[in-house]
Curated annotation (Swiss-Prot):
Binding residue positions for FAD: 13-18, 125, 180, 370
Functional note: NAD-binding protein involved in the addition of a carboxymethylaminomethyl (cmnm) group at the wobble position (U34) of certain tRNAs, forming tRNA-cmnm(5)s(2)U34.
Pfam families: GIDA, GIDA_C_1st, SAM_GIDA_C
UniProt entry tagged with the keyword NAD: yes
GO biological process, one term: tRNA wobble uridine modification
Subunit details: Homodimer. Heterotetramer of two MnmE and two MnmG subunits.
Subcellular location: Cytoplasm
Protein name: tRNA uridine 5-carboxymethylaminomethyl modification enzyme MnmG
Family membership: Belongs to the MnmG family.
Length: 629
């Protein structure tokens, strides 16, 4: 039977991608249905109890700037906040927070259940309704059919998921949850390229069996960072430390002597694992010269005794896991409460997607999260928001939207996936972005909130706060530009006391702030330039904008040159065999990838600058050279 009411957008899956997709579509006013196999696991942290990190924190800030959920949820659930790379430049500084799993899940569910235009329904999906190469709905396991104009697949590791512990394996979407086998089979019938990937998780330890007295503590930062541009530190719950231990030669001997029982090394697992989050088996074998590896013991929550040992993801048998755990300092009597495991699952080649994350072959079908070959909550959330907003726009007969590489880490993520694809779980790093200085955590709202408002993602409260911040920045910069001190002025002595070289000519507040030894905080304690802004976010922007003004202007020039290529569109139906002068290799790669623009084509491995020139000349001769607005 059909459900009596149609929907504009259906989201399948309630993880980090699905929840952001559902919230985005509903915020834009579209009638949205979130289908999940279990309402109680909405927003579940399946692996590590943390949000953020290098590159990842940037994505969280961008999701927040577009009105998303993740940053708000972690501000309510974070039990330790830190700024990584704090001693480095602002481009690579990143926020990271340990999470209380229960509080995080509660924050997500509360937001979902109070979001207008959003209905949540508990049923696993087993089929899609596809008519004339267009998706028009979904079918649940009890045969209930839902109609919609767009469907977003955010199914994580559930598609034909297989869990491995030692040489034993069984079907599962994650520990304790069933896999989605019928939906996997249905998707394999569609004209989509499919592969297998693998990820893993460490055993969880009973905190009562660890001797923390012999371990180093790691505390959070004070003052505490905040993730959301709308948040404040008073929202954070109680803060707790993490602890540090290490593997040792005994640990490594245990691992080496049991590799024949590892499903990875025994050839049982086909899927490729994450390069940047390797199992402890991989670490020991790949870095054979290392006699120890640092392991962070992270609390899973304020009311839980479970500890997440970050750094020993493993699929070795349980008895070997026990030996590994008990070989480390402080863990000699430790007890495992959940075994570690590896999970294999289906993913679909993201090169078959448009930059909006809509399928090139099935109209109205969007993909987001691990199904696209990524790993990580943050990467999933960012894709979910993009897929959700574009599903909403499609259902409202509007053009899709996707950020450029120069606009957001989300743009880098989507361009990498859709242009290059991936053969291993993709993780975001700041090193993947060419324009890091422009794509900082601190300016995510300045880059994206206005766009979010135009798209219908940003509410009135956020918009008012954003405009107030803009006004504070502009007013303060004007004040510093127009406030001067001369070498002969009475205030010069006070200023000179904070400079490595005394004033030799008249200087404005901005001139002084450009000096390496001067900070905004210090400058605004000096009589001519006091008082400081009370808006800390605006104050941070003033300092960064002034100090890096020249570098930012130079990078902006580079971006404008590159945009000419990004905006030169390539016909979706173009057969590159028609273009005389291209090598067979280039023709094959262009026909395989079907890039949307000259910019995308130039990033495909093997497509040379000479080939791009030939292509541009050919397009011009054919009268097909056109640029997007």
């Amino acid at each position: 039977m059909f459900y009596p009411d149609p929907f504009d957008v259906i989201i399948i899956g309630g993880g980090h991608a699905g929840t952001e997709a559902a919230m985005a579509a509903a915020r834009m006013g579209q009638q949205t249905l979130l289908l999940t196999h279990n309402i109680d696991t909405l927003g579940q942290m399946s692996c590590n109890p943390a949000i953020g990190g290098i590159g990842k924190g940037h994505l969280v800030k961008e999701v927040d700037a577009l009105g998303g959920l993740m940053a708000k949820a972690i501000d309510l659930a974070g039990i330790q906040f830190r700024i990584l790379n704090a001693s480095k430049g602002p481009a690579v500084r990143a926020t990271r927070a340990q999470a209380d799993r229960v509080l995080y899940r509660q924050a997500v569910r509360t937001a979902l259940e109070n979001q207008p235009n959003l209905m949540i329904f508990q049923q696993a999906v087993e089929d899609l309704i596809v008519e004339n190469d267009r998706v028009v709905g979904a079918v649940t396991q009890m045969g209930l059919k839902f109609r919609a104009k767009a469907v977003v697949l955010t199914v994580g590791t559930f598609l034909d998921g297989k869990i491995h512990i030692g040489l034993d394996n069984y079907s599962g979407g994650r520990a304790g949850d069933p896999p989605s086998i019928p939906l996997s089979r249905r998707l394999r019938e569609l004209p989509l390229r499919v592969g297998r990937l693998k990820t893993g998780t460490p055993p969880r330890i009973d905190a009562r069996t660890i001797d923390f007295s012999v371990l180093a503590q790691q505390h959070g930062d004070n003052p505490m960072p905040v993730f959301s541009f709308m948040g404040n530190a008073s929202q954070h719950p109680q803060q707790v430390p993490c602890y540090i231990t290490h593997t040792n030669e005994k640990t490594h001997d245990v691992i080496r002597s049991n590799l024949d029982r590892s499903p990875m090394y025994a050839g049982v697992i086909e899927g490729v694992g994450p390069r940047y989050c390797p199992s402890i088996e991989d670490k020991v074998m790949r870095f054979a010269d290392r006699n120890q590896h640092q392991i962070f013991l992270e609390p899973e929550g304020l009311t839980s005794n479970e500890i997440y040992p970050n750094g020993i993801s493993t699929s070795l048998p349980f008895d070997v896991q026990m030996q590994i755990v008990r070989s480390m300092q402080g863990m000699e009597n430790a007890k495992i409460v959940r075994p570690g495991y590896a999970i294999e699952y289906d993913f679909f080649d993201p090169r078959d997607l448009k930059p909006t994350l809509e399928s090139k072959f099935i109209q109205g079908l969007f993909f987001a999260g691990q199904i696209n070959g990524t790993t990580g909550y943050e990467e999933a959330a960012a894709q979910g928001l993009l897929a959700g907003l574009n599903a909403a726009r499609l259902s409202a007969d509007k053009e899709g939207w996707a950020p450029a590489r120069s606009q957001a880490y989300l743009g880098v993520l989507v361009d990498d996936l859709c242009t290059l694809g991936t053969k291993e779980p993709y993780r975001m790093f700041t090193s993947r972005a060419e324009y890091r200085l422009m794509l900082r955590e601190d300016n995510a709202d300045l880059r994206l909130t206005e766009i979010g408002r135009e798209l219908g993602l940003v509410d009135d409260e956020r918009w008012a706060r954003f405009n107030e911040k803009l006004e504070n920045i502009e007013r303060e910069r004007q004040r510093l530009k127009s406030t001067w001190v001369t070498p002969s002025a009475e205030a010069a002595a006070e200023v000179n006391a904070h400079l490595t070289a005394p004033l030799s000519r008249e200087a404005s507040g901005e001139d002084l702030l450009r000096r390496p030894e001067m900070t905004y905080e210090k400058l605004t304690t000096l009589t001519p330039f006091a008082p400081a802004l009370t808006d800390e976010q605006a104050a941070e922007q003033v300092e960064i904008q002034v100090k890096y003004e020249g570098y930012i202007a130079r990078q902006q020039d580079e971006i404008e040159k590159q945009l000419r290529n990004e905006n030169t569109l390539l016909p979706a139906t173009l057969d590159y065999r028609q273009v005389s002068g291209l090598s067979n290799e280039v023709i094959a790669k262009l026909n395989d990838h079907k890039p949307a623009s000259i910019g995308q084509a130039s990033r495909i491995s093997g497509v040379t600058p000479a080939a791009i020139s030939i292509l541009l000349v050919w397009l011009k001769k054919q009268g097909m050279l056109r640029r997007s607005a």
